[in-house]
UniProtKB/Swiss-Prot annotation:
GO terms for molecular function: metal ion binding; ubiquinol-cytochrome-c reductase activity. Heme 1 (or BL or b562) is low-potential and absorbs at about 562 nm, and heme 2 (or BH or b566) is high-potential and absorbs at about 566 nm. Its cofactor is heme b. Belongs to the cytochrome b family. A ubiquinone binds at residue 202. Pfam families: Cytochrom_B_C, Cytochrome_B. Binds 2 heme b groups non-covalently. It comes from Numida meleagris (Helmeted guineafowl). This is Cytochrome b. Heme b b562 binds at residues 84, 183.
Length: 380
């Protein structure tokens, strides 16, 4: 019999083993769609970003007008920019849901896959941050100033570090040029880490909603999950296109329509919505270094999750108390997101502090406690 090129060709063989003949659990739900959705978001961002970079000028006197020029004079430039800006929002929606799925179903017990995922999240956050600075509007400039300034809280080397990052004594032209370079570079770093992420995942195979071995019941990825992924894709692209075409500025800040001015501070400096939860935690601590540490901890705490798993069951499918706690954590994060968008005044300060405290308490103390309690309940 003639050899099947799909299974013998060195390159096609890799694609076949990853996307076609990949043995997949037969019972994974729509929560397992977000990996492929993230891949699609990523490719969309790379393509639109490349097209935008062709028309962008990384200079403080030209950046703002070059973005305006792209939207006004380049064929479909407005669409490319709107897809890129809102595509970032959908990227974060997908990654947060992907992480939430991992938390709920105990996927974090694949430690290498989980840890590379956390590194991916951090790299994505860095990419989004430097990208937001590029249009050089008011919020771009002041966001860059506030966030880079946080590094000055690091003892002894802080101030030197900040001036080194800025390329001067304030956010200026050198900062913008290096941020553009970083915004171009980091997506390729993300692509590399993604391949590592998938390599680790394919070592163990996918988890499933029951959290038990699915070796006895595997089905090929194609056509079953390829068609399921296409459904997920249409369900994501529809709202993305709707947003980009009908209300492209809904998630942006009106302040960014004003060119950057170092002499005028906006009344409320706040990041894009997907960073608000971390921003709220940062603002909840009245000490600069403490705030920076809490900000870092809010994301890095994910690295501790595998070590805080005390339950005998992997997933939360049959653990109602853990489920309740999980959804309380989700509500808590939504409250933090809302508080982060509000001015620093009563009652938002105290709400933010309570929500920050309950965020860390839930993850570090309550989840392990409830897991242990549920283990005891299994014996009765």
């Amino acid at each position: 019999m003639a050899p099947n090129i799909r299974k013998s060709h060195p390159l096609l063989k890799m694609i076949n083993n990853s996307l076609i003949d990949l043995p997949t659990p037969s019972n994974i739900s729509a929560w397992w769609n977000f990996g492929s959705l993230l891949a699609v978001c990523f490719m969309t961002q790379i393509i639109t970003g490349l097209l935008l970079a062709m028309h962008y000028t990384a200079d403080t006197s030209l950046a703002f007008s070059s973005v305006a020029h792209t939207c006004r004079n380049v064929q479909y430039g407005w669409l490319i920019r709107n897809l890129h800006a809102n595509g970032a929002s959908f990227f974060f929606i997908c990654i947060y849901l992907h992480i939430g799925r991992g938390l709920y179903y105990g996927s974090y017990l694949y430690k290498e896959t989980w840890n590379t995922g956390v590194i991916l999240l951090l790299t994505l956050m860095a990419t989004a941050f430097v990208g937001y600075v590029l249009p050089w509007g008011q919020m771009s400039f002041w966001g860059a100033t506030v966030i880079t300034n946080l590094f000055s809280a690091i003892p002894y080397i802080g101030q030197t570090l900040v001036e080194w990052a800025w390329g001067g004594f304030s956010v200026d032209n050198p900062t913008l040029t290096r941020f553009f370079a970083l915004h171009f570079l980091l997506p390729f770093v993300i692509a590399g880490i993604t391949i590592i992420h998938l390599t680790f995942l394919h070592e163990s195979g996918s988890n499933n909603p029951l959290g038990i071995s699915s070796n006895s019941d595997k089905i090929p990825f194609h056509p079953y999950y390829s068609i399921k992924d296409i459904l997920g894709l249409t369900l994501m692209l529809t709202p993305l296109l709707t947003l980009a075409l009908f209300s492209p500025n809904l998630l942006g800040d009106p302040e960014n329509f004003t060119p950057a001015n170092p002499l005028v501070t906006p009344p409320h400096i706040k990041p894009e919505w997907y960073f608000l939860f971390a921003y709220a935690i940062l603002r909840s601590i009245p000490n600069k270094l403490g705030g920076v540490l809490a900000l870092a901890a809010s994301v890095l705490i994910l690295l501790l999750i595998p070590f805080l798993h005390k339950s005998k069951q992997r997933t939360m499918t049959f653990r109602p108390f853990s489920q309740l706690l999980f959804w309380l954590l989700v509500a808590n994060l939504l409250i933090l997101t809302w508080v982060g968008s509000q001015p620093v005044e009563h009652p938002f300060i105290i709400i933010g502090q309570l929500a920050s405290l309950s965020y860390f308490t839930t993850l570090l103390i309550l989840f392990p406690m409830i897991g242990t309690l549920e283990n005891k309940m299994l014996n009765h």
